[in-house]
Amino acid sequence: MLAFTLRFIKNKRYLATLAGALVIIAGLTSQHAWSGNGLPQINGKALAALAKQHPVVVLFRHVERCDRSDNTCLSDSTGITVNGAQDARALGKAFSADIQNYNLYSSNTVRTIQSATWFSAGRSLTVDKKMMDCGSGIYASINTLLKKSQNKNIVIFTHNHCLTYIAKNKRGVKFDPDYLNALVMHAENGKLFLDGEFVPG
């Protein structure tokens, strides 16, 4: 009887240890899924909540470019594909459901201008060639746009190397954006903070 009791106690301890280990593993797995590439994921609702506190800056990479795809071009061979234009329109519609009030900017390339135009479906677009130059000066350029926009939310269509630079510089993470991937920043007391990656939905 004593031997049975001792075995029962040991089994309970083993099961408790195993259960604890599984909880830890599950937590780590969940954290990894949440962080993905090391950036917090921000959906439309979270973005809208952030925009109520601070002016937000959303920087999108342009859509599928024509010169690197076998898909049908929208028009200019240096611009975007028809598929890319449709993707931009769909994303813009979903984005506007959460953020209605924003000013729109793009770099001075055909692909970013077309991406922004299809994303916005008629919203006024301002082209700024500084959104092509991505280094330490990018933050001053963004702050200039915020001032021009009188601290309204702004959406910028730019390039993958800009997003990669900001993610590395602000959070020390490697970010290799696909078409229409985006970063979310907010302005506070004249400074820009990287909040995470925009994930539609």
Swiss-Prot record:
Localization terms from the record: Periplasm
Enzymatic class: hydrolase
InterPro entries the UniProt entry points to: His_PPase_superfam, LipoPS_heptP_Pase
GO MF, one example: phosphatase activity
Keyword Magnesium assigned: no
Key words, A-Z: Hydrolase, Periplasm, Signal
GO biological process: lipopolysaccharide metabolic process
One Gene Ontology term, aspect cellular component: periplasmic space
Top-level taxonomic group: Bacteria
Signal peptide start and end residues: 1-35
Main location class: periplasm
Pathway terms, separated by semicolons: Bacterial outer membrane biogenesis; lipopolysaccharide metabolism
E.C. number(s) listed in UniProt: 3.1.3.-
HAMAP family in the record: Ais (MF_01868)
Function as written in the Swiss-Prot or TrEMBL entry: Catalyzes the dephosphorylation of heptose(II) of the outer membrane lipopolysaccharide core.
Entry similarity comment: Belongs to the phosphoglycerate mutase family. Ais subfamily.
Record-given protein name: Lipopolysaccharide core heptose(II)-phosphate phosphatase
Species for this entry: Salmonella choleraesuis (strain SC-B67)
